[in-house]
Amino acid sequence: MDELVKRHGSTHFANINYGYYILFLSIIYIILLFCLRNYAKITTRSTRFFKKLYSLNPFIHLSILLIAIFIPFYQPHLNKLTVYYKRLGRLSYTLIPLNLFLTLKPNWFLPSQCTYTDFIPIHKWLSRFITFIAILHSILFLSHWSSSSDENVSIAIKLQNPKNVLGLIMLIPSLLLICLSIGPFRRFSYTSFYIIHNISNVMLIFLTPIHARPGVAIPYLIINSILLLAIAFNKIFFIKKSELLAKETLPNYDNNSSLVTIRLPRSALPETFTPACHIRISPYQFFNPLYWLLPSHPYTVVSLPSDDSVDLVLTENIKKFAFRLHMERSYTIINQFNPSVPIACLNSSKRVCIVCGGTGISFGLPLYRYFSEIIERNQRSIEYLRLIWMVKDKSQIKILEKLNSLKYDLEDKNFTSNFHVFITQYSSKSSGIEDSSGSGYELEDLTPEDPSSIGPYIFGSVNFGRRIEWTTDLSTFVEHDNDIDNTWMLACGPSTLVESANKYADKSGVRFASEIYTL
């Protein structure tokens, strides 16, 4: 030890306290998250900043974290650049516990106040930051070694140390991960991104303690290992084995995919679950290494606890190697995860508008059914309820007929009267059909050329060849003098739709919750 201190001077241990500071900062941040979601309340009078803070906006949260991280980063008495190069490396490792905490599914510390989807944006950007500073740490040292005037310092000499070789080995998957995390590459092959992501994480967690000097095994490796065990526990003990009861496909959803309904046995989920909850499905059993290496696939549950089966609506890519569910094959159902809809909305909302696009109907339908049942049973006064579904083509509406959980509801006019459909690519000129934005139109009357292509159900309105006009179509939704804090806009679908709904909700001063269906 004396020899080590003599060679490096007091700077060798200069970053240890900074690492403890980052760990302490992570703990404080988690406690603040707990307090924010347990004791703070969002109202229409809340500031825009506080709303973004509460909704875990990644820009707000990461800005706060980065300010706290870098305030003590520079210290005037530390004048050797290599001290800061090392500090970047220690920073990347000491942030991993916080990042792993954000990936817990479910999060035991915030079981009812947050869902794992709430943390995805923060986790995504924090992961990129960790990877970036780890890469920067490596590049700065390589640059320092290559440009040093000291004859005892060079890349060749430094790489004779196995610990430095480990650092170079970890650099390779980190560089690849940064490239694959770019949107177009990630969407092109999410599986490749996920594999590299897992490999890079495991290498960073378990090789860094060997590479780092001074060591980081205590307490960081111990904490990281405990969190990894918690993640593994969730993926082992909160699972069920199941086969498909039925699968029906609506072809030509778009050029590359088909719209599909899946029916699972009711036993796939526990006795009670939250409307619009998620499940994740893996084609492998937990003892198969591919169960851990490859991604599971998230789906929103269309059914309610009272149904006798579990329905899913999803798109399946027609590409050769795309993941698809098959009959007569066993799957692992991983947990059931709460949706992004706050408990306050489910328990106390009085005016609710649900807007969804495409397969976002899997989010909208269970929530609409949940609130409809509350109205039917007079459990609570709900003054306004509307479900709006936007589809590209009228044939997509046939998917409703294939849902076992809707077999009675679609025949109930009280249920469908507040269900409004927008068929965005329909050409009324070619069929001679006028826009039916009024109420009480029967679909088979609106499509005399092919009644069976939509079905004989009466909706509140069927709107052809256009998208929703927020202020016009929702003119009676917002009543500023009538409990605006219990007025909710819920949205699900492509990011463009969700962003439009969010802007409308923000402008109208109503509460908002959403899920975006994208990678």
Curated annotation (Swiss-Prot):
Q: Which residues form the Ferric oxidoreductase domain?
A: 88-207
What range(s) does the FAD-binding FR-type domain occupy? 237-366
Q: Which InterPro entries match?
A: FAD-bd_8 (IPR013112), Fe3_Rdtase_TM_dom (IPR013130), Fe_red_NAD-bd_6 (IPR013121), FNR_nucleotide-bd (IPR039261), RBOH/FRE (IPR050369)
Q: Is the keyword Transport assigned to this protein?
A: yes
Main location as per UniProt: membrane
Listed GO biological process terms: apoptotic process; reductive iron assimilation; regulation of actin cytoskeleton organization
Q: Name one GO molecular function term.
A: superoxide-generating NAD(P)H oxidase activity
Q: What does this protein do?
A: Probable cell surface metalloreductase. May be involved in iron or copper homeostasis.
Q: What is this protein called?
A: Probable metalloreductase AIM14
Q: Which gene encodes it?
A: AIM14
